[in-house]
Amino acid sequence: MANTSRLPTSCVIPTGGISTGSRRPAVVAFGCSTDGSRGSRRSGVGLVLCRSSSTAGAGGGRKMEDYNTAMKNMMRNPYEYHHDLGMNYAVITDNLIVGSQPQKPEDINHLKNEEKVAYILCLQQDKDIEYWGIDFQAIVSRCKDLGIQHIRRPAVDFDPDSLRSQLPKAVSALEWAISQCKGRVYVHCTAGLGRAPAVAITYMYWFNNMDLNTAYDKLTSIRPCGPNKRAIRAATYDLAKNDPWKEPFENLPEHAFEGIADWERKLIQERVRALREA
């Protein structure tokens, strides 16, 4: 059994490939030659594979094996993360992209030049980045060079309580970045299938006049994944209910806060926007 004490945790790509039932999102795979030029090929899904610069090297296979074993033991879901395939992402809306961690500065070049990204919202903790041997300072430096604003709102991976508590601040940062209308926002965690889609779904739920299931289905039909819906419902409850005698969330039915009244949405939006200065 893998030693999970040293592993960061993250949701990952399904072993059986990505499918959306009858709909197949268009895949674009990018390659980068030694002189930095790119080639691309399309196959038919919303997933984009940017293979300019995977950091997988010696021991990378073992790291992925340990990581995926830990993930299956802790989360019992069908997903796996293949770091060796490079950064991957899906365009969710005209201004919102959800994906995996950038691995090299070349990935930042791609996001800027090919996807017109102006903001990157990173949900990883330091240990998540260090585990994969990514030169984080080089990533941040390239963002600065290209005029991309890099924002961090870390949450503990595979921890629904951490996700619940961090969603309001992460969504606040995302809503602010989108409101600036300067370019797309790239939201990522490690694999882009847990924390990052949860933040994107929550943003659509709270700010795009959708119920939770509609927002959840919209994103997962484009990028198949399994973000924690209960954590989103709990974060919604935390913001919408300020009565000190309110019934604990844990006592509510499973469907509670999958939808909200207009006044609750307005209250949530006010509270989330107030976190910009927090």
Language model features with spans:
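Non-catalytic positions within long, well-ordered alpha-helices that form the structural scaffold/packing
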Residues: 112-116, 178
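Beta-strand-turn-beta hairpins that frame and shape the catalytic cleft
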Residues: 89-96, 148
